[in-house]
Amino acid sequence: MNEQTILGLDVGERRIGVAISDVEARIAAPLTTIPAHPPERAIAQIARLVAERGVRRVVVGLPLTMRGEHGPQAAAIQRFVDALAAVLNCPVEMFDERLTSVAAEQMLRNLGVKPAKIKEQIDQVAASIILQDYLDARRNPF
């Protein structure tokens, strides 16, 4: 596989969780959480991370329903992805994010993270789950 660092995003109404892969695009790790508003500032921060980290692709979580249909947030995420893609010099794609926030919260609880700290970390952990699922799906497409 070509060496390429991939950024994963969990875009929420208030915050955007950010995760990053290793250069071999095998392992995802939480990176940071940035405010979602104003969107222009969030996009500028993401663009800066892409440039600083040598990111070759961005993966954004797509909120699907349990039936695999576009959820109520999907249109807003699509607008964000379109605006982000317009300023980046790398591909931006969406990937199913079903249940990632639930999994992230459970993971943090299992690690003994105090409830007050979970809110600070949940978005970037969810982004790392989205990105890891994406990386795994690329390696094992079936």
From Swiss-Prot:
Instruction: Name the GO terms of the biological process aspect.
Output: rRNA 5'-end processing
Predominant place of localization: cytoplasm
Give the source's domain of life in one word.
Answer: Bacteria
**Which Pfam families does the entry link to?**
RuvX (PF03652)
Q: Per its UniProt record, what SUPFAM superfamilies does this chain match?
A: Ribonuclease H-like (SSF53098)
Q: Which GO terms describe its molecular function?
A: nuclease activity
Q: Which residues form a coiled coil?
A: none
Question: Which key words are in the record?
Answer: Cytoplasm, Hydrolase, Nuclease, Ribosome biogenesis
| Subcellular location, record wording | Cytoplasm
Query: Could you say which EC number(s) this protein's record lists?
Result: 3.1.-.-
Output a single Gene Ontology CC term carried by this record.
cytosol
Cross-referenced HAMAP family, in alphabetical order?
Answer: Nuclease_YqgF
The protein's job, in short, is:
Could be a nuclease involved in processing of the 5'-end of pre-16S rRNA.
Concerning NCBIfam families, the annotation shows: RNAse_H_YqgF
Classification via PANTHER family: POLYNUCLEOTIDYL TRANSFERASE, RIBONUCLEASE H-LIKE SUPERFAMILY PROTEIN
Please state which protein family the record places this protein in: Belongs to the YqgF nuclease family.
Q: What name does UniProt use for this protein?
A: Putative pre-16S rRNA nuclease
What's the source species for this entry?
Answer: Chloroflexus aggregans (strain MD-66 / DSM 9485)
